């Protein structure tokens, strides 16, 4: 029987990115778009979110509608040299991730440079057998980040495993839905306290609902470890 393969998201899954880093990335994206597209800050922020919701990544909307250079965008908007200012201390993260039995691939729509630096800061670089960042998500010359079904099918082929031996760990419903449609096992990790509080305040607490495409729902990696043999 093939060992399980874990496809693990980065921000708001491995750690609580809402602490500071996601706000900083969004701020830099908004500033970049305001400058390049000659928009007000409010217009740029609205467009950033609209592209993210429509395409799964703001970058795809900018490439499709404005011919933005993807590598320049990623370089300008993802912290690197100063990333340590925006990432909370993560005690025991290496121990917890290493206890997930099987092969582990990091799967993130963020840039490779950002992902590798963040793994280093979290002490998780040696915990992953492979890192798949947005630069690695080109198919037939076009970027196909999560939740692209083309990407998910390619990962399934590359894994050499039946879909039932692959487990996607993510915080976004669209990504979990795509994996579920292919027969992969899915777990939603609600690591962001900010997101949980916003959902609770809106009257729709995340913990109170588990969609059919989510096999397991937990608040942290520690809980995932205890339930890692979910089916």
Regions found by a protein language model. Give the residues of each.
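Short glycine/serine/threonine/alanine-rich loop segments
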Residues: 39, 68, 102, 161, ...
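Conserved phosphate-coupling serine/threonine residues in phosphotransfer and NTP-handling enzymes
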Residues: 108-110
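N-terminal helical cap/lid subdomain that shapes the substrate entry/recognition surface
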Residues: 2-8, 13-92, 113
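Short, surface-exposed loop/turn motifs that are enriched in glycine and acidic residues
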Residues: 83, 104-105, 141-145
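Catalytic-core regions built around general acid/base machinery
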Residues: 92-101
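Asp-based, Mg2+/Mn2+-dependent phosphohydrolase catalytic module
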Residues: 1-3, 98, 112, 116-231
């Amino acid at each position: 029987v093939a060992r399980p393969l874990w496809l693990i998201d980065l921000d708001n899954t491995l750690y609580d990115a809402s602490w500071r880093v996601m706000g900083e990335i969004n701020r830099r994206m908004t500033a970049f778009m305001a400058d390049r597209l000659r928009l007000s800050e409010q217009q740029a922020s609205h467009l950033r979110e609209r592209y993210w919701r429509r395409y799964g990544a703001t970058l795809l909307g900018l490439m499709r509608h404005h011919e933005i250079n993807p590598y320049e965008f990623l370089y300008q908007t993802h912290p690197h040299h100063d990333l340590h200012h925006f990432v909370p201390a993560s005690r025991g993260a290496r121990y917890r991730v290493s206890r997930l039995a099987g092969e582990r691939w990091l799967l993130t729509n963020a840039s490779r440079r950002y992902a590798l630096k963040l793994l280093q800061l979290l002490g998780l670089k040696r915990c992953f057998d492979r890192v798949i960042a947005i630069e690695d998500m080109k198919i037939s010359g076009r970027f196909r980040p999560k939740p692209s079904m083309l990407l998910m099918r390619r990962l399934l082929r590359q894994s050499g495993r039946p879909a039932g031996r692959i487990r996607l760990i993510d915080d976004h419903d669209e990504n979990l839905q795509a994996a579920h449609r292919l027969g992969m096992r899915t777990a939603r990790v609600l690591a962001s306290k900010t997101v949980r509080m916003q959902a609770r305040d809106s009257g729709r607490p995340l913990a109170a609902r588990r969609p059919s495409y989510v096999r397991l729902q937990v608040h942290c990696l520690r809980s995932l470890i205890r339930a890692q043999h979910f089916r």
